[in-house]
Amino acid sequence: MKRIYLASIVALLASMPGTPGASQAFGNAITVDGDQVFVGEASYEMRSGVVYVFGRDPSGSWIQTQRIEPSSGVPGDRFGIGLAKHENTLLISATRADEGAGAVYVYQNQNGTWIESGRLETTDRSPADSLGTGLAITNDWIMVGTIAQNDRTGAAYAFRREGESWVQHSTIRPADIDEGDTFGSRIALQGNQMLISAPFGSDGEGRVYSFTYSEDSDTWEESGQLQAPGLSEETMFGTDIAIENNVSLVGAPGYFGGTGAGTGAVFVYGLAGDTWQLASLLSPYESTGAIQFGGSIAFDGNAALIGAFSAAQGQGRIFSYTFNRETFEWTAASKISSAETGRAFFGRTVDFSGDIAVGVANGADRGAGAAWVFERTDNNWTSAGRITGDVLGMDAITGDEVSCSTEGEASGFDCESVDLVSFLPLAHMGAERGIVTNDVWGWTDPETGQEIVLVGMTNQTAFVDVTDPGMPTYLGRLPMPETANASTWRDMKVYQDHMYVVSDGAGEHGMQVFDLTRLRGLNGSDPQTFASDAHYDQIASAHNIVINEETGFAYSVGSSGGGQTCGGGLHMINIQDPLAPVFAGCFQDMSTGRQRTGYSHDAQCVVYHGPDTDYQGHEICLGSNETALSIADVTDKSNPLTVAMASYPNVGYSHQGWLSEDHSYFFMGDELDESGGNVTNTRTLIWDLADLDDPILAREYMAETKATDHNLYILGNTMYQSNYKSGLRVLDISDPENPQLVGNFDTVPYGGDDASMTGSWSNYPYFKSGVVVVTSSREGLFVVRYRPRTISE
């Protein structure tokens, strides 16, 4: 049986070459056959996809027995996005193989191990066809869909067995399909009958075409479309289909609601001659709302499992039915749940064989995905275990430093004047499945000189020793508090050998305080899991923590969810006694922030020594406040003062910035101006601070890239920008109003430099050794070195 599911089809359309996603996506496709379960994990950009094979050990537990990888796999090939199996033959799609033309790999079972035996391609293939979207196999035929062909019109290809080989037989393409229909999304095959869906046809109503094989003409002849009443735009009729014993089921997850997210329904047809006639309609029992019932279907002729992945507020459910062939009646048997919580989307895809069923929750493990195995007794399905894949990614790069070549490449990463010293993938830093990096900071041990990287992650802070930068060593981790939840955002800063950690959208997280001297003497042979040394509970969640090391004050910004939020503005904390933080007051500039509460997304607080003599020696905070630059004098914590507010053209989201070392300029990024279309290229705002009361936008520096900017830092006359998909950008700001690009290192070696928010989150350029550490969310930690080239080089 199958399977590729609705989300995979949508993902394929959104991820043609040039616009990739990066999620792990365990369970893109599944198939169950006897006591074996096959699970695809296709959505890798930094490596080829994989397919896992699971079976039972002697105790009855489900374990991984094989991991299948293609012999000619390449990063981002989507290997595993479609599966089909018949007896000892297994088909695995790789829709983006060969520059998007796509291919289907053929495997044979040899003594319990699946061995690659061939590869199917089409004779008229072209880039971006995405061969392998729909997939079906019988003893004599293999049918393969290619939804992206001809501007997503789509097509299907028939391959017929000839001896031990599969030979391309014909191309199947109805005369009335249009651009964007995605014909070939799903294929169901039984004997000489075949159904092929185009779920985006007719503006999303969806179509399902019927074909019959004629031995006389040796062709698959179109025999009409399946009729379904009440379809509307984005019903997506044909999202999933199944055939068994002359009965077919067709899912329409947008039915009773539309927009692809209705209550959903499954249409049941019976075969009369060569015509499929509508017999009944299945709708979910004991559930209402936009649950997308029919997004996935499994049917063996006597029972059906139907996924509704949006049921229960996104937890997901699978509905079980039994079928009486004599009366053509259906009986609701049970509703199957997993033990996942939150928006796990259980039921995104489902399959079963005999008394073994598998349902995928592709939102589990923070989007990495998981699958649940169920066993049936007397029509009741009970959980038999949870299965997941491995933590995969790029290989670690350690040892000798890799110079950026004259061609602008270092170990496969585009670069200029930035050398790759080393790289640690997520799995080498204690990350579990679905965990990604975010912010980064550093600490140098004043006694030993050790340089330690503080790596923010979804649920923890990892410690990596880069004293020997070519051989980075993972020392351990500080998990989030037990009262918190995992979150995209984590931020860390250091004061007097103590680390302070906050997290946004993390519930009752508060601020963790950790004594970094506890890392002394560790060599990584036994990575430690630490507990905080102190915990500050006057805030719950916060977007960033700002520290002025000269004064011993910290500033929680973007606070929310409980405690004293200060409207998201500056929540001031005295940390002069590092383990005993004390609330010191609030500052809010009510003319800033989207809700006009003074919300600050990030800030920098310093003892000012710039050109404005009125404020020299004062403690000044410069806030990136969503809508504007905010400048505050917080010298007197009991009476903080607004100094200035300055807006600028084409605001998207004032995000983060950093002062020049002489405090004459403030360089600021706007996170949403690129993705929102406010500007065409990556923009950096340059503020002239000669008069703090009247900051002047001196220049908008436009890079040649289109990536979204994120965090930037300045050391001397050099600015280090982390700009998501374009990676680390190094600029010479000797002439502050005319920055010059002097180096770069792309941490995301795929998918161009569009404005999507994946890639380099942040960097830390302040180690005395001269290395710069860079986090890239789904890749890991890069240790690089900016090395200006001479003319002779």
Task: Say what each PLM segment does.
Residues 1-6:
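Bacterial N-terminal signal peptides that target proteins for export
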Residues 7-15:
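Bacterial N-terminal signal peptides
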Residues 21-793:
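Feature marking well-ordered beta-strand scaffolds used for ligand recognition
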